[in-house]
Amino acid sequence: MQQLEEVVGQARAEIEGVSDIAALDEIRVKYLGKKGFFTEQMKGLGALSAEERPAAGAVINQAKQQVQDALNERREALEIAVLNQKLAAETIDVSLPGRRIENGGLHPVTRTIERIERLFGEMGFKVARGPEIEDGFHNFDALNIPAHHPARTDHDTFYFNPDLMLRTHTSGVQIRTMEHQQPPIRIIAPGRVYRNDYDMTHTPMFHQVEGLLVDEHASFTELKGILHDFLRNYFEEDLTIRFRPSYFPFTEPSAEVDVMGKNGKWLEVLGCGMVHPNVLRSVGIDPEKYSGFAFGMGVERLTMLRYGVNDLRAFFENDLRFLKQFK
């Protein structure tokens, strides 16, 4: 018994004296391993009588447990010390700035659409949307565009079948709105449109914003005032603006709107006019009671004029050197 107490004391002293886990494992093997001190002591129990064996075994196990507890306690302390040392070596300066993430930006065409929606929204216009695949009635017939009109040929229009096509303008949204809503109507219809054309100033897909107002006393004077306000707010300049006579099948009278450029030349920016009575009749609105006006503009053209871009195709080539200028 006294010998075991001495061994336990010696083991505890050795355990407290180690400074790393490898040395601690050597002590564990020395005392608790297959050939360790306590294993040999247990083997010696066979030499004792059956009456002495249980008491002696209990004493040995108690001493063995004391050594095991000392080993566990020391191992935990060493592991904590190793962890603290590792954490100290890997200290992070949390005050250092992080890696800069480059933020994206809206496409210039998207910026223009949002700007147009906001400016007309301030004048009481709501945004209306419709399908990009249209039928002949909504894309042509209801807009007073006859069957022989050149816009209806496959040179200008992408057809799926004789009566189904990619819309060539967002005017179909105006027709659908008038079919389902009684005047007063005050909407703009932004969206993608498609025409069979491709050069520096045309692409097969481009964006339009068309507007429509139908009420009992809509007038060309009101149309001019709205477009004057829009253009001056859009370009943020007190522009010189002119309305010159033009022709569109769906408006009468019709006009095109020009602004004076910095080079002293007129630049066409949009078309407009009073809604043709035939268009109102096609959707069940009485032209004797109601009148209306409509206008339409190419978003890419307005974007080119605002940002000084010369080639329309640059908007669709995904060149980051170009797009980063608009962030």
UniProtKB/Swiss-Prot annotation:
Give the domain of life.
Bacteria
The record's catalysed reaction(s) read: tRNA(Phe) + L-phenylalanine + ATP = L-phenylalanyl-tRNA(Phe) + AMP + diphosphate + H(+)
Per the entry, which co-factors are needed? Mg(2+)
Q: Name one GO biological process term.
A: phenylalanyl-tRNA aminoacylation
Q: Which GO terms describe its cellular component?
A: cytoplasm
The EC number(s) attached to this protein equal: 6.1.1.20
A GO molecular-function term, please? ATP binding
Cofactor, free-text remark: Binds 2 magnesium ions per tetramer.
Q: Where in the cell is it found?
A: Cytoplasm
What the entry lists under SUPFAM superfamilies is as follows: Class II aaRS and biotin synthetases, tRNA-binding arm
UniProt keyword annotation of Metal-binding present: yes
Which residues bind Mg(2+) per the record? E252
Q: Which UniProt keywords apply?
A: Aminoacyl-tRNA synthetase, ATP-binding, Cytoplasm, Ligase, Magnesium, Metal-binding, Nucleotide-binding, Protein biosynthesis
| KW Transport (keyword) present | no
Q: What family does this chain come from, according to its entry?
A: Belongs to the class-II aminoacyl-tRNA synthetase family. Phe-tRNA synthetase alpha subunit type 1 subfamily.
Record text on subunit structure and interactions:
Tetramer of two alpha and two beta subunits.
User: Which PANTHER family is this protein grouped with?
Assistant: PHENYLALANINE--TRNA LIGASE, MITOCHONDRIAL, PHENYLALANYL-TRNA SYNTHETASE
- What's the name of the protein? Phenylalanine--tRNA ligase alpha subunit
Please tell me the species this chain comes from: Aeromonas hydrophila subsp. hydrophila (strain ATCC 7966 / DSM 30187 / BCRC 13018 / CCUG 14551 / JCM 1027 / KCTC 2358 / NCIMB 9240 / NCTC 8049)
